[in-house]
Amino acid sequence: MLNHKVSVIVPVYNSEVYLPMCIESILAQSYKNIEIILIDDGSRDNSLEICKRYANVDNRIKVIHQENKGVSAARNVGIDASEGEYITFVDSDDELLTNGIFLLVKDIEDFDADIATASKIYV
């Protein structure tokens, strides 16, 4: 049954140009049982403010700010903060297809898999 909570972890560093598109694409997912964890990795632009603005209007969004430690450290912080049964990573300049998370969860459950991945699409 497709109802497992998915933690969407997004490391953020100086992504103000692409970040709104990324967050909007996650919020538009057809699979709604998600939490979005935005880890600002010491951005010097307006990325942290953008993260906070979205968190103020959707309680599924958590914002964590840390000094710059790199993308791997940011992902690890996101894992530690996650509450979902499944975890997926999205880069802050990515845009997801509306059914992207649904398809990953469906494949995990249909095939009793431990992991699912998705391909990149360049437009």
Where are these regions (language model features)?
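Nucleotide-sugar donor-binding/catalytic module of glycosyltransferases
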Residues: 1-123
